[in-house]
Amino acid sequence: MKEKGRLLKDSFIIGATGLSLNLVGLWFNIYLSGTLGTEGIGLFQLIASAYMLATTFATSGINLSVTRVVAEALSLPETRKTATRRFRKCLAVSAALGGFACLLLFVFSGVIARSVLCRPETEMCFRILAFGLPFMSAGSCLNGFFVAERKAYKTAIANGTEEICKIVFAVLVFALHPPTSLVSGCVGLVLGLVGGEAVSCILAYAFWLADEKTLPRSKGGTAGTVRKMLAIGAPVAASSYLRTGLTTVENLSVPVGLVRYGMTDSDALAAFGAVKSLAVPVIFFPASFMYAFIKVMIPEVARAYTLGKTDAIRERGGHIIRLTLVFSSIVTGIFLVFYAPLGALLFDNAETGKLLLYLAPLIPAMYVDGVADGILKGMDEQVAVMRYNIYEAIIRLVVVFTLIPVLGFAGFMATVYAGNVINTSFSLARLRRKAGIKTEPFGSVVLPTCLTVAAGFLFKSVFSFWQSRFSVIVEVFITAVLCAAVYAFFLFPKLREKIRASSPRQNARNRVRRNIL
């Protein structure tokens, strides 16, 4: 019971922080759409896509490998006292990797701007972004340590500080020097991004210095730490390098394909920016609490895997997958019903709200893919995850080159669907094969979606008299709470028993039995 309480507490901390940060981030994206326009956001997304290659090189595999190395060291009595020294080695490797990535990006920023983006004016953005890589690499390592140490609140505070600082710095830059062009706006954004990374890393390092004084120390051997770190992180890194490379090519090719279809360059950038920076963040916004469970459960699955507790993996993993599918299906139903008023409320544009409708059926696959990958990584199945990510990236790239020039925006949507469905299918099949975790599509996806759609239309008609753009908030809230309560009643037997036990009829029966006795 104490263990479950701790897990729920950690999940709540990370989830509440993630929800708050996503809300702030969503506001910031909407603010940017008004400041730079969707075309400016699209240009920044292209810069970010190219920048992903450098961030992947600087951080890929670090967080997971540090979490695994430290969690395994802390779980065994004979290695517990060496956890701090093992982490120091991991931090040194991370810092070196981040510094090298910084040097590479700074030197080749001009080549990337001219030859990759074909926009020489963006060179300054890459030069500024290079200085954020060492902070990003070290911060990823430090956050991995906090997760392994079961101190989720420190990761939450560091990440929260980072996101808030990014936004505050960018808004200050725009206030002091209003953007006069798309590129000047992007420069303001990257300045905020680098500033946020630096503050977050410094804060996380201060947390670690305080923790180091309380952890047990030993002069025991730590040989093999770097080798183990590389063994865990290398497959993830290799997958990320290849997948990020393919994803970068895909993202850079989408506007090109839309132009070939017949769109203007401005319209193509605007469409790309609307999907990546407006619709997708809204789609993933409700998942904050769900992804909190992933971060907390990875070290738990790693410990269970280390100790050979396959039943625990199957029970916990199956429960998480089932909850994820039900939760994502409720979200799907809400977007299917309320896409238009949500678009008008969030973007002041019902047409942009249609993007929520187009992406809504894909939400269960989007959500459960991240959960399944997290469980598999905890079971030392990162090589399989690597393969599936590569398969997805290749398929998406093929669809980009073949369908977008022919179908335009519909081809863009086909790209998103094809990759997510295939990757999720592979991951769930692997979980079933390795851990016996099964899924029930009808009970976990179809029924909750239909229930939510029915409830949504019901409350939409009930509140039809309320002609306000904010009425959708009440309608969505009531629909979500009702559907979640109904499914919680069926999914949690203990909760169902408590409700029945506290009912007036059951209380009357209990009194009669006591009187008879």
Range-by-range predicted roles:
Residues 60-75, 283-308:
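Helix-loop junctions and terminal segments of transmembrane helices
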Residues 460-517:
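Membrane-proximal transmembrane or re-entrant/amphipathic helices at the cytosolic face
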Residues 6-67, 102, 106, 132-133, ...:
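Signature of the first transmembrane helix
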Residues 21, 25, 29, 60-67, ...:
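Short runs within selected transmembrane alpha-helices of multi-pass transporters and secretion channels
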Residues 1-24, 85-88, 220-243, 311, ...:
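N-terminal membrane topogenesis motif
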Residues 109-129, 335-366, 370:
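Interfacial segments at transmembrane-helix termini and the short loops linking adjacent helices
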Residues 98-245:
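Hydrophobic transmembrane helix module of multi-pass membrane transport proteins
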